[in-house]
Amino acid sequence: MAAWGRRRLGPGSGGGGARERVSLSATDCYIVHEIYNGENAQDQFEYELEQALEAQYKYIVIEPTRIGDETARWITVGNCLHKTTVLAGTACLFTPLALPLDYSHYISLPAGVLSLACCTLYGISWQFDPCCKYQVEYDAYRLSRLPLHTLTSSTPVVLVRKDDLHRKRLHNTIALAALVYCVKKIYELCAV
């Protein structure tokens, strides 16, 4: 019981409080190095990133600043669309429970349309992009486990592969429920 709350240290750590550096296999981490070889270096970086995404490495470290920033922004926009779909769809579905029925459709219908629009845009632009399986890693402990000491860049972008099956199911289920609600509500408003 006294060991609760303590981190177990690996062999050879001596119990001195230092965390063990976990070695990763070659299939776990890929580094897109910032090495300029001629005029087509940027294209080479993009090609390496595409190959790493398609190979489904657990971690991808992107040294080139421009490509790293573009990739991080692309992932952020996809996350924003996903969250907007879920939150707007939830607002669409729960607004009729919180507001009087005479006024709830003024909020629920626009929220439902927003949810459907974001879901459609996500489905067209992000759903089949291999980049949507990755998230930008910010956790200092997880970053300390990666071989970042070999990099030449001081601000690399680190991507970690995450299973997004449940996230997509939630996303699509809420958007579909919002669609059903909107169609039903529009039918009721037009029939009156």
UniProtKB/Swiss-Prot annotation:
GO terms for cellular component: mitochondrial inner membrane. InterPro entries: TMEM11 (IPR026120). One of its GO terms (biological process) is mitochondrion organization. The keyword Transferase does not apply. It is a multi-pass membrane protein. It comes from the Eukaryota. Keywords: Membrane, Mitochondrion, Mitochondrion inner membrane, Transmembrane, Transmembrane helix. It is found in: Mitochondrion inner membrane. The chain crosses the membrane at residues 84-100, 107-124. Its main location: mitochondrion. Residues 1-20 are annotated as: Disordered. Plays a role in mitochondrial morphogenesis. Associates with the mitochondrial contact site and cristae organizing system (MICOS) complex, composed of at least MICOS10/MIC10, CHCHD3/MIC19, CHCHD6/MIC25, APOOL/MIC27, IMMT/MIC60, APOO/MIC23/MIC26 and QIL1/MIC13. This complex was also known under the names MINOS or MitOS complex. The MICOS complex associates with mitochondrial outer membrane proteins SAMM50, MTX1, MTX2 and DNAJC11, mitochondrial inner membrane protein TMEM11 and with HSPA9. Interacts with IMMT/MIC60. Belongs to the TMEM11 family. This is Transmembrane protein 11, mitochondrial. The gene is TMEM11.
